[in-house]
């Protein structure tokens, strides 16, 4: 099934078609790199892209559940045509899972590139709260993807082991003998189980179990294809798991984080000192401005009212003309009372 999956994926790549989610993330990264967004808007765009990745993770989990259910259903089928139809369904699920995994890988790499661009912005350098938040979120997504990888790995092991048991039971049904481990591994790895059973039928004349041969062949084809696709899917997951471990080690580097934290604390203290200096200067110049404004207001009031004009001997201005003083008549001469008598 892996061949079918890888073939369909290669076809989609050759056609030049790209997943819409990946395109959206690349477009948002272009906006960030173009500097069209500030810090808050960058985080908004970042978390929108994270939501896209979460949706793909949910889709991957759904496909894994479908594959597990189909494998359980295959245990109840004993008809070649039914097994063939189920094989097609499982092929489609594994193909979709591989496409989703590759899209997830591309989206996570796009988020890493966006984080690199964000580190070049002011206040968002390596070790900053914004950088650590973004890096932790991306690594969390990778760990979720690693969990999905483990689920698919368990499904692959289950399918392989159950197929081995099925081939052993079929050989026992036809030949009357259960093959040893080496023979069973050789039959499964080389695909000679059908030839082996056909020889047994020819020797024993059991033409009535041709349906069993067809069923085994369909199961063999299905398991081989699925195993190939799951191996390819597993390799994609392993590539991302290496990045998770590497970046997780960087996050867990306590000594380095403490040094970066000390550097940020010192930088913050220096900025507080500068802010205090600017605050004092601002207050001083504010007082000067208020004093100057008061002086200007006083001068305006003085020159508007002109209090010196209300005082008689005041300063400047044209001199007033003196009012002429009327001379009073002299008193009448005194009369000698004696003469009158």
From Swiss-Prot:
Residues recorded with modification N-acetylmethionine: 1
Reported function: Vesicle trafficking protein that functions in the secretory pathway.
CDD domains named among the record's database cross-references: SNARE_syntaxin1-like, SynN
Record field: compositional bias (Polar residues): 8-21, 126-137
Name of the encoding gene: SYP122
Assembly, per entry: Part of the t-SNARE complex.
Domain of life: Eukaryota
UniProt family annotation: Belongs to the syntaxin family.
Coiled-coil boundaries: 64-185
SMART domains: SynN, t_SNARE
Cytoplasmic-facing ranges: 1-284
Alphabetical list of InterPro entries matching this protein: SNARE, Syntaxin, Syntaxin/epimorphin_CS, Syntaxin_N, T_SNARE_dom
Domain (t-SNARE coiled-coil homology): residue spans on this chain: 213-275
Keywords, alphabetical: Acetylation, Coiled coil, Membrane, Protein transport, Transmembrane, Transmembrane helix, Transport
Protein name in UniProt: Syntaxin-122
GO cellular component, one term: plasma membrane
GO MF term list: SNAP receptor activity
Localisation per UniProt entry: Membrane
Positions on the Vesicular side per record topology: 306-341
Stretches that traverse the bilayer: 285-305
Record-linked SUPFAM superfamilies: t-snare proteins (SSF47661)
